[in-house]
């Protein structure tokens, strides 16, 4: 009954201690999961921020992008390391001290080769395998996976196929096979510090990253010089490492001389405390060192756990409780140490990255965007003011143009009327008189050719006069206006001129000159001279002129005396001759014959003189006089119509100038509106960007707060 009670007591104590140690180890798993989540969010945070910077032209800064990419790469690297971070326990000691047996006891199952003598031939790293992997053993840096049963051949020094001492053999087991592996704990078994002196590099590579170092001693002997030297080397490389000393095989040592058990135990404690405090300096007080020294039997603990010992004795229970105390203490120490050593640097790195990101990127970018928003708002306000000024200027220029156009129109009417009247009054008579070409009145066809040549001559002179006196000045004034309002000088403006097609031939198409001889003292001539108008025979049907052009037709033949007899016949038959006869009869009755004869002689002399003077030149002068008077008369009647044509041409060209100016002004206005719209769009996009950056800053602060909570939860209280 006593043995049963002791068994139940041992079971309850074991359960309590196991629960306590498991809770501490689970903190590591929880902390690792939480820190992985934080780093995952931090990676997404940096990735999203990098995307914003790459898509935003205003914030593109090569150096900043490189810094951000470096942060992102660093976070990814730490996240990969963090996923591999596990709590690591390294077991050291001479061969045959029971290192493998201690590990098997922790695993609750004999996994590693364990026997008397030199057993473990290489470094064995026992760890949980991946979720999709089967249990296997694997030599480091090799891809071949071997069954777990191959462990006895590869890791046992008694096997001919044993690996070299410098080789690392990874033993991957299922998490549910052993509770300690479920908490990301890695157990490192070593070949023995006394196997060879050339294992320093391997120890540095495989064991120096351990969170807890356990020195397994043989309780049947004392600490050897090799073991002392090894831990001195460890203490020199690490700052106050967590060292535990297991005096294994205490069941054997205590059974040799039971009466000396306590003295031997005290001797072991004294020497171990001296090693930990005085020689290694890893603990400050003897009490701290005392709590890290244990007297156990790993083989007994394994047998109890696998059911080989069902009714342990009292001493066996004491040794097993000591092993449980060791397991609990090292688990707590392992969790605390691993939290600090594994997660402390990662925590500081994340905090440093967030602080640097905030100080070098986010805050400067928020300030830069705010400054750009203010600058663009100021530019937009200036553009709006410029648009208002431009609208006012356009209205002023429009009114000024209208005033200039009215002045030009009035000038065109005034100058055009003056030029045309001056042409009619002075230029036509002088130009007709100065025209020189052979004149043959006896040939009607030649007179028609003469008239056409005279018309062409006048057309050229009159058109040139209008061009010089009206068209060119108008062109210059229009060019000055275009320069004043800032219009580019177009080719059509330089080539523009008034169109003035005179075509005198059309005006004079029904002109029929009277080149017959008329005595100046004849009654008909005197009568018409009194009336002030010499008759010019013309066709009763005048061809109507077209606007800006006239119909062409052959000139009418002139009225001339065919020969002397015809001229005499016309004199006899004419009204003037009859009047002369009547007047002579009255003179004979009123005066005496001598007076009548004298007067008749004088009149006859004048007649003979005029007839003799009626030469070709005189007929040409008469032709020109009749032509000039009729052309003046007809042009004078068309002055207003011609001036109206000038005004219409000017208005059409001024309308073109106005349209060009309106188009250019509207183009400038549209450009200002487009620039304003672009600035508004930029401001809106930058405001969205500013809001995004502020959200990123808040997310960064949230991540920093999570890191602070993590530190408070898992690191500070430890």
From Swiss-Prot:
GO cellular component, one term: membrane
Class of this enzyme: hydrolase
Membrane topology (Cytoplasmic): 1-575, 615-718
MF-aspect GO terms: GTP binding; GTPase activity
Membrane topology: Multi-pass membrane protein
Biological processes annotated in GO: mitochondrial fusion; mitochondrion localization; Nebenkern assembly; positive regulation of mitochondrial fusion; sperm mitochondrion organization; spermatogenesis
Ranges where the record places region G4 motif: 248-251
Coiled coil: 366-402, 664-687
Database matches in InterPro entries: Dynamin_N, Fzo/mitofusin_HR2, G_DYNAMIN_dom, Mitofusin_fam, P-loop_NTPase
Superkingdom of origin organism: Eukaryota
TM segment ranges: 576-588, 592-614
Annotated family: Belongs to the TRAFAC class dynamin-like GTPase superfamily. Dynamin/Fzo/YdjA family. Mitofusin subfamily.
UniProt name for this protein: Transmembrane GTPase fzo
Species of origin: Drosophila melanogaster (Fruit fly)
């Amino acid at each position: 009954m006593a043995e049963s009670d002791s068994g139940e007591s041992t079971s309850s104590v074991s359960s309590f201690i196991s629960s306590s140690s498991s809770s501490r180890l689970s903190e590591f798993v929880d902390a690792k999961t939480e820190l992985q989540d934080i780093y995952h969010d931090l990676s997404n945070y940096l990735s999203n921020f990098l995307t914003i910077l790459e898509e935003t032209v205003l914030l593109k800064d090569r150096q900043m992008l490189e810094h951000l990419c470096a942060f992102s790469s660093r976070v990814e690297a730490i996240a990969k390391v963090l996923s591999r971070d596990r709590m690591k326990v390294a077991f050291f000691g001479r061969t045959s001290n029971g290192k493998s047996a201690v590990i098997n006891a922790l695993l609750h199952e004999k996994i590693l080769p364990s026997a008397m003598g030199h057993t473990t031939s290489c470094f064995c790293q026992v760890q949980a395998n991946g979720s999709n992997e089967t249990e296997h053993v694997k030599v480091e840096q090799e891809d071949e996976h071997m069954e777990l049963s191959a462990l006895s051949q590869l890791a046992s020094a008694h096997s001919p196929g044993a690996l070299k001492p410098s080789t690392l053999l990874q033993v991957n087991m299922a998490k549910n096979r052993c509770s300690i592996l479920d908490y990301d704990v890695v157990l490192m078994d070593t070949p023995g510090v006394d196997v060879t002196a050339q294992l320093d590099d391997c120890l540095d590579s495989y064991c120096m990253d351990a969170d807890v170092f356990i020195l397994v001693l043989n309780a049947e002997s004392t600490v050897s010089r090799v073991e002392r030297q090894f831990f001195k080397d460890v203490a020199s490389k690490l700052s106050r490492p967590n060292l535990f000393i297991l005096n294994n095989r205490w069941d054997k040592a205590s059974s040799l001389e039971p009466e000396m058990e306590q003295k031997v135990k005290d001797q072991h404690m004294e020497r171990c405390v001296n090693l930990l405090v005085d020689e290694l300096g890893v603990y400050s007080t003897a009490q701290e060192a005392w709590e890290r020294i244990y007297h156990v039997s790993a083989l007994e603990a394994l047998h109890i756990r696998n059911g080989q010992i069902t009714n342990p004795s009292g001493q066996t229970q004491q040794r097993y409780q000591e092993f449980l105390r060791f397991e609990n203490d090292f688990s707590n120490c392992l969790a605390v140490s691993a939290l600090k050593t594994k997660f402390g640097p990662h925590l500081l790195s994340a905090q440093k990255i967030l602080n640097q990101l905030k100080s070098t990127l986010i805050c400067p970018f928020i300030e830069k965007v705010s400054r750009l928003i203010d600058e663009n708002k100021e530019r937009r306000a200036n553009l709006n003011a410029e648009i208002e000024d431009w609208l006012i200027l356009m209205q002023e220029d429009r009114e000024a143009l209208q005033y200039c156009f009215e002045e030009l129109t009035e000038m065109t009417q005034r100058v055009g009327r003056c030029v045309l009247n001056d042409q009619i009054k002075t230029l036509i008579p002088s130009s007709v008189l100065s025209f020189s070409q052979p004149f043959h009145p006896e040939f009607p066809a030649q007179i028609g050719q003469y008239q056409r040549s005279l018309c062409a001559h006048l057309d050229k002179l009159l058109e040139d006069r209008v061009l010089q006196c009206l068209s060119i000045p108008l062109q210059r004034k229009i060019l000055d206006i275009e320069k004043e309002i800032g219009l580019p000088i177009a080719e059509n403006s330089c080539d523009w001129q008034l169109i003035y097609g005179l075509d005198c031939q059309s005006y004079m198409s029904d002109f029929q000159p009277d080149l017959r001889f008329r005595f100046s003292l004849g009654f008909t001539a005197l009568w018409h001279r009194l009336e002030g108008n010499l008759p010019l025979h013309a066709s009763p049907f005048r061809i109507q002129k077209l606007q800006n052009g006239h119909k062409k037709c052959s000139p009418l033949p002139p009225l001339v005396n065919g020969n002397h007899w015809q001229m005499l016949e016309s004199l006899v038959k004419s009204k003037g001759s009859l009047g002369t006869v009547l007047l002579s009869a009255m003179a004979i009755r009123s005066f005496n014959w001598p007076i009548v004869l004298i007067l008749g002689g004088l009149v006859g002399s004048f007649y003979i003189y005029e007839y003799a003077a009626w030469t070709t030149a005189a007929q040409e002068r008469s032709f020109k006089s009749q032509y000039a008077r009729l052309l003046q008369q007809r042009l004078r009647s068309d002055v207003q119509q011609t001036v109206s044509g000038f005004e219409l041409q000017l208005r059409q060209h001024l309308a073109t100038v106005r349209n060009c100016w309106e188009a250019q002004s509207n183009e400038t206005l549209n450009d200002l509106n487009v620039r304003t719209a672009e600035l508004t769009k930029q401001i809106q996009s930058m405001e969205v960007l500013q809001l995004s950056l502020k959200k990123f800053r808040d997310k960064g602060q949230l991540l920093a707060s999570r890191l602070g909570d993590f530190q408070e939860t898992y690191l500070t209280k430890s």
